[in-house]
């Protein structure tokens, strides 16, 4: 899935769109996407000027965005002005390796369960095959 299709499945835009490409998706099961991390990211201006590291909360947000794509594809839907997916929870978040400019952050998401508009996922972010972060994520679909 290229950036054009990603933009059709996520409401996020620059500077907050954190998924560049989807490599593999199995609706109802899993997604493998990535984010190219460059020194041009606006958050590197202050985090940290002499030792740039991607903030952990943005790694979690990138994982949540990939989970959102998976959810929309699993429902065979696209975002609408009447519906929103809220990032509803994070459990067991762990940060194992700093993510730096030049890294390609691979986002791996598996659906653990979905019930009544609430989705739970197992999420991992990897750089060069090494675990950078992991968490259990929860999102909730709500009508506006």
Swiss-Prot record:
The record's EC number reads 4.2.1.59
Per the record, GO CC terms? cytoplasm; membrane
The alphabetical list of record keywords is: Cytoplasm, Lipid A biosynthesis, Lipid biosynthesis, Lipid metabolism, Lyase
- What Gene3D superfamilies does this protein's entry cite? Hotdog Thioesterase
Q: What is its main location?
A: cytoplasm
Top EC class, one word = lyase
Cellular compartment(s): Cytoplasm
MF annotations from Gene Ontology: (3R)-hydroxyacyl-[acyl-carrier-protein] dehydratase activity
Q: Where is the active site?
A: 47
Which one GO biological process term can you cite for this protein? fatty acid biosynthetic process
Which reactions does this protein catalyse? a (3R)-hydroxyacyl-[ACP] = a (2E)-enoyl-[ACP] + H2O
> Tell me, what does this protein do in biology?
Involved in unsaturated fatty acids biosynthesis. Catalyzes the dehydration of short chain beta-hydroxyacyl-ACPs and long chain saturated and unsaturated beta-hydroxyacyl-ACPs.
Please state which protein family the record places this protein in.
Belongs to the thioester dehydratase family. FabZ subfamily.
What this protein is called in its record is 3-hydroxyacyl-[acyl-carrier-protein] dehydratase FabZ
Provenance organism: Dechloromonas aromatica (strain RCB)
The taxonomic lineage of its organism, from the top, reads: Bacteria, Pseudomonadati, Pseudomonadota, Betaproteobacteria, Rhodocyclales
| Gene assigned in the entry | fabZ
